[in-house]
């Protein structure tokens, strides 16, 4: 049962009619995308905060129509109809609502709580209609405030709760951002329980929580050392199909260590292996602290079923078994490195290369096609797919734009051709790799030079060049080609921007690790292909219970990667 807070008036007998009515709405209607219980209370809410709504406000402020005037529209056009599009746009931008939005955005950027509250009070005095956006920015700015003390009172927190109440009174429909900012307010007041209540209430409004929605409650409970409540929030996340990231898992790891819950530490390490793979320095240090702790020394079994462990490793694809802590006694914990073959320089154990399920690859290719068709001109991408079926498969796909610019001030066809030749040399079929280039690079600039034009014609005649159409993002093309051909992808692109985040953290990092080839160019060695490592750079758990944890680095070509090796001093 939810606690009765200022954010849960619907659970009080003295609640406002708005929330009381919502409890009577059948669930089949409550979650319908077109149903909104607020319509019966505020007919203009359907366009509240939208461009249409702002137009309505401008027109009402300029022309207070009556029925007779409206009936006379046939004989004379209203002044608003004579306004140019530019004038209408200017009127919208200068409306009280738009000006308030601009000023609140500036307060949000600067974290200026006092100015935001002053603007809010002024807007209410002047009768400015606040939209969902206005309220969300106000709540966000108030949530930035730190907890008040006797010597330093903070008006942002107390006023934030009042603003939330006023939003409900004004019958403004809340969204995910509203509840998330409310949760942040609660945590700023040192009340993670209230923050968790906010997340629970989202379902009553048909709102799907996001990862950021859970952060205030989860981190709040972890800071307080309330492990049970933190696990409850985590379970709610799993139920809502919200996937945690490293900060959330690190917080759960810390609270599990502090409460000496070895089973939870083990499960969290497995989740870090699955979802994060390589950990940041702070998490790396925390894991090192665990293996050096007395609790870790005393945790584990002396005997285990070797066949069961081995079968679990095989069924999991290699690199882990998930059967719990193996062995007893003190851990030998060292920071180390791997050699080029994946052999630990500390314990001499060779790390494994974790398999990729072929079914996963096919599913990923289908997902990639769907995403590309949503963001590219579908006909263009389908045309590329048909071309690839006729000319493929290839042993390697080259991100031409990236390869021509590595360590170069301007695009270099010489370097791109050098990359093509190196890839052809290592190809089992000795076939030319597929070069993906934007049409602008194929038709203009250095491409017009006779030598480069001849090179492009050679690739084109061999069916090894594809020019992506104007306005397209060539990233979709070279990535799809490499995935569908199950071949190497030659690019120094780290693939971390928004486009690649759409692909998720489950399969794509594993695929990239096994298929991406990067180049390095030096005066001494010239151009060198850096092949995928023969082992997986991911947290690994051996059949004897030994752990190897990799630290994430920006560029492991330039910086050697540190690993944590944790092995029992005594083995059965």
From Swiss-Prot:
Q: What is its EC number?
A: 3.1.26.5
From the UniProt record, list the reaction(s) this protein catalyses: Endonucleolytic cleavage of RNA, removing 5'-extranucleotides from tRNA precursor
Residues the entry annotates as binding Mn(2+) 1? 399, 474
The note on the cofactor says:
Binds 2 Mg(2+) or Mg(2+) ions per subunit.
Q: Does the keyword Coiled coil apply?
A: no
How changing residue 399 to N affects the protein? Answer: Abolishes ribonuclease activity
Q: Which CDD domains match?
A: PIN_PRORP-Zc3h12a-like
Presequence boundaries: 1-70
The subcellular location is: Mitochondrion; Plastid, Chloroplast
Kindly state one GO CC term assigned in the UniProt record.
Answer: chloroplast
Q: Which cofactor does it need?
A: Mg(2+); Mn(2+)
The residues listed in the UniProt record as binding Mn(2+) 2, with positions renumbered to this chain, are 475, 493
Residues in PRORP domain copies: 338-565
Tell me, according to the record, the phenotype of the null mutant. Embryo lethality when homozygous.
Which GO biological process annotations does it have?
tRNA 5'-leader removal; tRNA processing
Summarize the protein's role: Endonuclease RNase P responsible for the 5' maturation of tRNA precursors. Preferentially cleaves at the unusual cleavage site, but also able to cleave at the classical cleavage site. Also involved in the maturation of mRNAs in mitochondria.
Q: Which family does it belong to?
A: Belongs to the PPR family. P subfamily.
- Please give the name of this protein: Proteinaceous RNase P 1, chloroplastic/mitochondrial
Look up and give the organism this protein is from. Arabidopsis thaliana (Mouse-ear cress)
Phylogenetic placement of the source organism: Eukaryota, Viridiplantae, Streptophyta, Embryophyta, Tracheophyta
Q: Quick one: which gene encodes this?
A: PRORP1
């Amino acid at each position: 049962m939810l606690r009765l807070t200022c954010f849960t008036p619907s659970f009080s007998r003295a609640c406002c009619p708005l929330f009381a009515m919502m409890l009577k709405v059948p669930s089949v209607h409550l979650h319908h995308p077109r149903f909104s219980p607020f319509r019966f209370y505020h007919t203009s809410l359907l366009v509240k905060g939208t461009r249409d709504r702002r137009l309505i406000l401008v027109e009402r402020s300029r022309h207070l129509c009556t029925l007779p005037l409206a009936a006379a529209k046939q004989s004379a056009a209203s002044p608003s109809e004579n306004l140019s599009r530019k004038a209408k746009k200017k009127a919208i931008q200068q409306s009280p609502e738009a000006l308030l939005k601009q000023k609140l955005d500036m307060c949000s950027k600067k974290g200026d709580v006092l100015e935001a509250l002053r603007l809010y009070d002024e807007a209410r005095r002047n009768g400015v209609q606040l939209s969902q956006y206005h309220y969300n920015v106000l709540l966000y700015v108030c949530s930035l405030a730190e907890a008040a003390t006797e010597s330093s009172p903070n008006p942002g927190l107390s006023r934030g709760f009042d603003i939330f109440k006023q939003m409900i009174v004004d019958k403004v429909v809340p969204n995910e951002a509203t509840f998330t900012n409310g949760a942040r307010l609660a945590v700023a007041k040192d009340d993670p329980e209230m923050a968790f209540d906010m997340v629970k209430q989202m379902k009553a409004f048909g709102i799907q929580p996001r990862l950021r929605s859970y952060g205030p409650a989860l981190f709040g409970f972890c800071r307080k050392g309330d492990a049970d409540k933190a696990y409850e929030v985590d379970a709610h996340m799993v139920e809502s199909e919200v996937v945690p990231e490293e900060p959330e898992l690190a917080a759960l790891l810390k609270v599990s260590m502090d409460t000496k819950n070895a089973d939870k530490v083990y499960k969290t390490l497995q989740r870090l292996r699955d979802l994060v793979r390589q950990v940041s320095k702070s998490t790396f240090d925390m894991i090192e602290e665990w293996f050096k702790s007395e609790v870790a020394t005393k945790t584990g079994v002396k005997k285990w079923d070797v066949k069961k462990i081995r079968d679990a490793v095989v069924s999991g694809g290699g690199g882990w078994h998930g059967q719990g802590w193996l062995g007893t006694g003190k851990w030998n914990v060292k920071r180390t490195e791997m050699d080029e073959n994946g052999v630990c320089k500390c314990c001499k154990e060779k790390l494994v290369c974790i398999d990729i399920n072929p079914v996963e690859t096919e599913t990923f290719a289908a997902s990639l096609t769907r995403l590309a068709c949503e963001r590219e001109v579908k006909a263009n991408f389908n045309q590329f797919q048909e071309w690839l079926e006729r000319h493929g498969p290839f042993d390697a796909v080259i991100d031409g734009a990236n390869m021509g610019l590595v360590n170069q001030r301007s695009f270099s066809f010489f370097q791109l051709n050098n990359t093509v030749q190196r890839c052809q040399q290592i190809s089992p079929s000795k076939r030319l790799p597929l070069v993906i280039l934007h049409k602008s690079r194929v038709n203009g600039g250095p491409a017009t030079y006779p030598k480069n034009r001849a090179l492009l014609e050679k690739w084109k005649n061999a069916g090894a060049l594809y020019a992506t159409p104007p306005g397209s993002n060539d990233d979709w093309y070279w990535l799809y080609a490499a995935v569908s051909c199950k071949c190497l992808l030659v690019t120094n692109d780290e693939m971390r921007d928004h486009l690649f985040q759409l692909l998720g953290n489950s399969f794509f990092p594993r695929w990239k690790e096994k298929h991406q080839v990067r180049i390095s160019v030096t005066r001494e060695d010239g151009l060198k292909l850096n092949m995928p490592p023969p082992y997986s750079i991911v947290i690994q758990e051996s059949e004897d219970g030994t752990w190897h944890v990799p630290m994430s680095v920006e560029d492991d070509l330039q910086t050697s990667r540190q690993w944590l090796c944790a092995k029992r001093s005594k083995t059965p």
